[in-house]
From Swiss-Prot:
One GO cellular component term noted in the UniProt record for this chain: membrane
Annotated membrane topology: Multi-pass membrane protein
Annotated keywords: Membrane, Transmembrane, Transmembrane helix
Protein name: Serpentine receptor class alpha-2
Keyword field contains Transmembrane: yes
Family membership noted in the UniProt record: Belongs to the nematode receptor-like protein sra family.
A GO MF term: olfactory receptor activity
Phylogenetic classification of the source organism: Eukaryota, Metazoa, Ecdysozoa, Nematoda, Chromadorea
Coiled-coil residues: none
Species assigned in the record: Caenorhabditis elegans
Transmembrane regions listed in the UniProt entry: 25-45, 57-77, 104-124, 144-164, 188-208, 240-260, 273-293
Biological process annotations from GO: detection of chemical stimulus involved in sensory perception
Chief place of localization: membrane
UniProt subcellular location: Membrane
Amino acid sequence: MSNSSCADEDLIIRFDSLNQKAAQFVYLLAIILTFITTYFAVKILFTQSFFEISTKILLVQNLFYANLYQFFHGIEAVRMLYKSFFMINDPCNFMEPEIECVFYYKIILMGSSGMVYGQTGLLIERLCATFSKDYKKKQSAIKCAVISILVLICSSSTGRLIVWDDPIDKYNFACYIPPKESYIRANHYFTMCAVLSTINFCISTFILKYNKRCEYQTRFKVGARFQKQELIESTKAICFLTVSQFVAVFLNSFGMIVLVYIQESISHRIFNLLVVWLYAFPIVVLMFPVILVHQIRSSRWRRALKIKVIKNEKQTQDDHMKHMKNMWI
């Protein structure tokens, strides 16, 4: 962030480095792969998964936010590569006016916040499915609509709230950087996202543990057990997806926090070398459709295996009670 449109020497050195250029190319590759894997994820989601329609819609909404973020971050990556190759000798036209960046910044925040809020929405939907005794299509459709609208409203408002009263009269080297006067609120937002991701992780762990204990409650009712197994497998896939995203975001955020903390103790060269790789959010976003595809295929395999076990299993009442006792130990 700067009051001048001219870049300082450290920024020019950073953009001129092979490390910076390589990182932007890797980001672009991750962005392109996100678009490709999203196509396969949506196709598999509607042709091979046994998720409820409400879960499918919320997953598609999350994929939309992921691709929205990647698209606009890709525009920034191309801009930064252009500067690295063609504007190094023109430092006074290097910086971007905040007034021209604010639209991109709001959209990028809409994408990133939409993914976090969307994960929370998915877990709320799974909580309803897990604890509702009669989770019919009509009920799931209503809950899905409410969650989707809330996620849309919150994600659309995030960027506007952060830059609410910012004069937006400074300069930045990239449009995904928050405006100078909004920097503190942007940090509060990222802290909120970290807390919300942690809450999502705790909810996912609770649901997984609860479903594990409830898995054998319908041991002697094959039809009910089959339906329960479908619910457990779909919920397990969503929870694993959330846990994986939490781990990725946590490592990314923790790395950035450590780097900022030791910034004064290391040289500009080392800082510039590390920061572009620790801020690798396009790679984190790529993981979402990839893990989704993996989870759909894995859940189908586990479901088929469980059906086979249910059909072939012959268990006495004593065996069942022993297994139930072990589950609660």
